[in-house]
């Protein structure tokens, strides 16, 4: 091998030559789109009797949570685009000293991580798109879950798309800890068994397809049909239907129905000790927006009595379940990700938006979970339940928004008595 050494003068000459051939910054970034989010949250909760569980993302005391996402998409020509997104979401600086944060200190040494990185190819003239790499999955069963996946979308006409996807691996950790975890069921006292099942849920590939219809034919009708196979875990299928009737320039009435079903694989059921079963979720609600007022009325039923069921793959999915309270869908027994027994809830909300884009609202949820599963470790989430929420929202601009809520969640179990959890979240978010 022949080694070549450059003198300092030669190295400077090479650097100068490279600089002369470099593109100006303005030209280099003209086909690059920058996106970002800066989010701050303050969260706190307190609970008596300890039967509700810590499934909710508001599981700490006096937590200051910071999340930063920075992304860029470069158009490299001929329909190809490259997207990358870095995220900082390790921060959970507790102002309250406990066993998890014994010194109550603020971490400043946590790194950014690569959250998304994918190649996108679009054939605009043919309505075809392809995305390959680490990306948000965007399914009805996930919220902002990331995975290494391939996704193809074909849009033959405006408002209608056909999608197919294959997920090779799922995100290891989510910032809000809302991936499925049997450790929070209070059913399996063996920690090693819990860990084995948790890793097993996301161990295998997922394949699926969807029909996506938005305002079909200008009728105000949306129809989304989904199917997916999470190998050796469950087969999922879902329908999300909605109709919107305009009542004016800014006023409307909307009716939405969601059905989610699945068939659990026998091998997964055996891991859980034969207490799992196929599940179904039904949710129906109507929403009206009129003269600054908004109101929602609906009902939801999911799960199966005395069985463990999977309803969503991460968080509450993306089928509009976030209109139901704030905490109740995360509580023990009624967690939508993996639940014990059958949960039936009725819910309502009302709000008013003042001039200046300040909104105040109230939410209420009543119902319960039918469940008699027990391990002698305590309540598994059965009994009567209710939640009452105060919402505050302020839209300073299209980029900067503030919101907060205060929730009171109640459980009433005949054996383990009454439990109450108070939770609060304050948030400021800037997006660009």
Residue ranges of model-derived segments:
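Solvent-exposed loop/turn segments connecting transmembrane beta-strands
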Residues: 111, 136-149, 170-173, 201-203, ...
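Detector for outer-membrane/organellar transmembrane beta-barrel domains
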Residues: 182, 214, 218-220, 242-373
């Amino acid at each position: 091998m022949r080694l070549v050494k450059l003198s300092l003068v030669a190295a400077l000459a090479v650097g100068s030559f490279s600089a002369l051939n470099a593109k100006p910054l303005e030209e280099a970034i003209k086909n690059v789109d920058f996106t970002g989010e800066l989010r701050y949250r303050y969260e706190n909760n307190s609970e008596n009797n300890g039967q509700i569980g810590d499934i909710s993302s508001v599981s700490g005391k006096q937590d200051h949570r910071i999340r930063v996402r920075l992304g860029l998409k470069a158009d490299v020509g001929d329909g190809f685009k490259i997207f990358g997104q870095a995220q900082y979401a390790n921060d959970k600086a507790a102002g309250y000293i406990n066993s998890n944060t014994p010194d109550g200190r603020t971490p400043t040494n946590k790194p950014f991580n690569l959250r998304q990185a994918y190649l996108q190819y679009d054939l605009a003239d043919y309505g075809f798109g392809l995305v390959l790499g680490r990306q948000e999955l965007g399914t009805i069963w996930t919220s902002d879950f990331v995975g290494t996946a391939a996704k193809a979308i074909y849009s033959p006409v405006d408002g209608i798309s056909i999608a197919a996807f294959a997920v090779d691996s799922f995100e290891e950790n989510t910032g809000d800890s809302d991936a499925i975890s049997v450790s929070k069921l209070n059913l399996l006292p063996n920690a090693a068994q819990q860990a084995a099942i948790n890793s097993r849920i996301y161990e295998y590939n997922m394949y699926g397809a969807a029909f996506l219809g938005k305002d079909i034919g200008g009728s105000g009708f949306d129809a989304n049909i989904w199917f997916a196979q999470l190998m050796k875990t469950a087969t999922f299928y879902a329908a999300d239907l909605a109709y919107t009737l305009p009542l004016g320039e800014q006023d409307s009435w909307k009716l939405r129905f969601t059905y989610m079903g699945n068939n659990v694989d026998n091998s997964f059921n055996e891991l859980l000790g034969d207490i799992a079963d196929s599940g179904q979720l039904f949710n129906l609600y109507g929403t009206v927006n009129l003269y600054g007022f908004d109101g929602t009325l609906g009902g939801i039923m999911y799960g199966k009595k005395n069985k463990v069921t999977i309803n969503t793959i991460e968080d509450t999915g993306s089928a509009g379940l976030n209109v139901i309270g704030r905490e109740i869908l995360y509580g023990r027994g009624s967690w939508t990700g993996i639940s014990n027994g059958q949960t039936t809830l009725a819910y309502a909300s009302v709000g008013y938006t003042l001039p200046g884009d300040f909104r105040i609202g109230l939410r209420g949820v009543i119902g319960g979970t039918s469940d008699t599963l027990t391990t002698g470790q305590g309540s598994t989430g059965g009994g009567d339940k209710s939640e009452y929420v105060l919402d505050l929202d302020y839209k300073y601009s299209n980029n900067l928004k503030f919101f907060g809520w205060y929730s009171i969640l109640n459980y009433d179990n005949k054996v383990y008595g009454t439990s109450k959890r108070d939770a609060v979240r304050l948030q400021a978010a800037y997006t660009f």
